[in-house]
């Protein structure tokens, strides 16, 4: 599924019945959240609120509200095809040189895709049709959603933040929520390990006391948005990955007030700076955990320029107890992660992050066990291989006869193949999401690994149980007469 920008993608969704235009007057204060939440839980379409109360700018919600729409946004026909995206990322992370002419021929499609990686720089762009500076910059004219009753203020949720550290050539793209402080100021909530925060930290070391340039794109094309939340290799820019997904180069334009490049087709661009040392208390906000988070201090982003399309659309979402849009994204991106893990750990059969576990706090792994202690090695690998899993609190490892995505199967393995003392690993003082108020210290907590695999010699002195399985002959015999028995309708 190919498209050029967000509007092109919305047209494709509308053709497929995956976009609902709402002409009723709907308030960005709480009402949009309730409507979007009910729609998402029902597996409904993306929503375009064309008449937000008090504003003349439409609001787009629930864009990635189903795994199928996430797949479409990544240029794929269905969710299963996301495995191919994962295979491509695994290849780019650790490319294998061709072993011969035949292997070279087989790899040609991947090499052809790589040709779409460089960005295309434009001198004029739709995102700069309207230019506002100084006192004309006014975020209160944008219908930023106030999502939950006890939220501190309206919250920008889908802002694609563009930064560049002083020691890096490529830009970093990240999604960080931004609390609106006033007409030209927001709070940039980025965690210390995220790319934008690391760029800022390095900038402060290299240029102490100097303002750090930042730009934020709202309403970028889906491939670029999804590239920012996908585990791309550190050597690959999110713009380059978006070009791979889209099948054509990502078009960018230089910002008016700094040297950063932003998606040319975006709806709205915020340009400005972060003053080192300028912090503000952020929150509380209802979050993907299903709770309001604690108040904490983060840098203030001052906006000097606001550029946009003439008829801009504001792209937004909400976060809350799963399922929400981030949880749906997690379900889809799970399919991308599996081939990346399998490239490093070929023994892994499947990997599953249940959305009820806040998309990353609990992982279930199934594997082909080959030796005593193998499950514990895989646990350690999951925690250390990708940054995305550094906050995963629980890792459950099962044999490949268990369906990682069937909780009944997993519970059976835990209760029949585990001794709690022998088969549980506990680690203290590890990185934990600061939103996890269950940890004893903000940002620091424990992890648990559960080895629910069959135990090998050396792991137990007991004779291990044999699973009960009916013979194939009897199964086939009953299959032939099952319908005639007329037992279950």
Swiss-Prot record:
Enzyme class: lyase
Active site: 287
Cofactor dependency: prenylated FMN; Mn(2+)
Subcellular location(s) of the protein: Cell membrane
GO BP annotations listed: ubiquinone biosynthetic process
Membrane topology qualifier: Peripheral membrane protein
Single GO MF descriptor: metal ion binding
Cofactor binding description: Binds 1 prenylated FMN per subunit.
Pfam family, one: UbiD_N
One GO CC term, this protein: cytosol
Known catalytic reactions: a 4-hydroxy-3-(all-trans-polyprenyl)benzoate + H(+) = a 2-(all-trans-polyprenyl)phenol + CO2
Gene3D superfamilies per the UniProt record, alphabetical: Single helix bin (1.20.5.570), UbiD C-terminal domain-like (3.40.1670.10)
Keywords for this protein: Cell membrane, Decarboxylase, Flavoprotein, FMN, Lyase, Manganese, Membrane, Metal-binding, Ubiquinone biosynthesis
Residues bound to Mn(2+): 172, 238
Pathway(s): Cofactor biosynthesis; ubiquinone biosynthesis
InterPro entries for the chain: UbiD, UbiD-like_C, UbiD-like_N, UbiD_bacteria, UbiD_Rift_dom
Sequence positions that bind prenylated FMN: 175-177, 189-191, 194-195
Main function: Catalyzes the decarboxylation of 3-octaprenyl-4-hydroxy benzoate to 2-octaprenylphenol, an intermediate step in ubiquinone biosynthesis.
Family per record: Belongs to the UbiD family.
Subunit structure, interactors included: Homohexamer.
Name by which UniProt lists this protein: 3-octaprenyl-4-hydroxybenzoate carboxy-lyase
Organism, as annotated: Proteus mirabilis (strain HI4320)
Protein encoded by which gene: ubiD
């Amino acid at each position: 599924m190919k498209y050029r920008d967000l509007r092109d993608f919305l047209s494709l969704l509308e053709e497929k019945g995956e976009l609902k235009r709402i002409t009723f007057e709907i308030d960005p204060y709480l009402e949009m959240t309730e409507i979007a939440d009910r729609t998402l839980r029902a597996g409904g379409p993306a929503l375009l609120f064309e008449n937000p109360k008090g504003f003349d700018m439409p609001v787009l919600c629930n864009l990635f509200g189903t795994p199928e729409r996430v797949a479409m946004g990544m240029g794929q026909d269905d969710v299963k095809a996301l495995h191919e995206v994962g295979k491509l990322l695994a290849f780019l992370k650790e490319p294998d040189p061709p072993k011969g002419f035949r292997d070279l021929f087989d790899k040609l499609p991947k090499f052809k895709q790589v040709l779409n990686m460089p960005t295309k720089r434009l001198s004029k762009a739709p995102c700069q049709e309207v230019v506002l500076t100084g006192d004309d910059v006014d975020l209160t004219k944008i219908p930023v959603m106030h999502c939950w009753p006890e939220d501190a203020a309206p919250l920008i949720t889908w802002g694609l933040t563009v930064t560049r550290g002083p020691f890096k050539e490529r830009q970093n793209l990240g999604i960080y929520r931004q609390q609106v402080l006033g007409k030209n100021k927001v709070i940039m909530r980025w965690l210390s390990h995220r790319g934008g925060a690391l760029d800022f930290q390095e900038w402060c070391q290299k240029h102490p006391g100097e303002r750090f340039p930042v730009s934020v794109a709202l309403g970028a094309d889906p491939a670029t948005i999804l590239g920012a939340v996908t585990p791309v290799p550190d050597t690959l820019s999110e713009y380059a990955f978006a070009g791979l997904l889209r099948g054509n180069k990502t078009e960018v334009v230089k910002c008016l007030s700094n040297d950063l490049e932003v998606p040319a087709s975006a709806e709205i661009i915020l340009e400005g700076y972060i003053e080192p040392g300028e912090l503000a208390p952020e929150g509380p906000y209802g979050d993907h955990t299903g709770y309001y988070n604690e108040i904490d201090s983060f840098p203030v982003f001052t906006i000097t320029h606001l550029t946009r399309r003439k008829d801009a659309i504001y792209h937004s979402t909400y976060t809350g107890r799963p399922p929400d849009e981030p949880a749906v994204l997690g379900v889809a991106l799970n399919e991308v992660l599996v081939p990346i893990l399998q490239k490093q750990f070929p023994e892994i059969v499947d990997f599953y992050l249940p959305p009820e576990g806040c998309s990353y706090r609990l992982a279930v792994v199934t594997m082909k066990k080959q030796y005593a202690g193998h499950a514990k090695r895989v646990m350690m690998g999951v925690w250390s291989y990708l940054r995305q899993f550094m906050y995963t609190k629980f890792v459950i490892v099962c044999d490949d006869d268990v369906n990682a995505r069937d909780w009944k199967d997993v519970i059976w393995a835990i209760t029949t193949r585990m001794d709690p003392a022998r088969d549980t690993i506990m680690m203290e003082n590890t990185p934990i999401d600061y939103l996890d108020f269950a940890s004893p210290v903000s940002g620091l907590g424990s992890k648990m690994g559960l080895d629910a695999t069959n135990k090998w010699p050396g792991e137990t002195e007991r004779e291990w149980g044999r699973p009960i399985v009916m013979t194939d002959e009897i199964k086939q015999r009953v299959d032939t007469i099952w319908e005639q028995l007329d037992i279950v309708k």
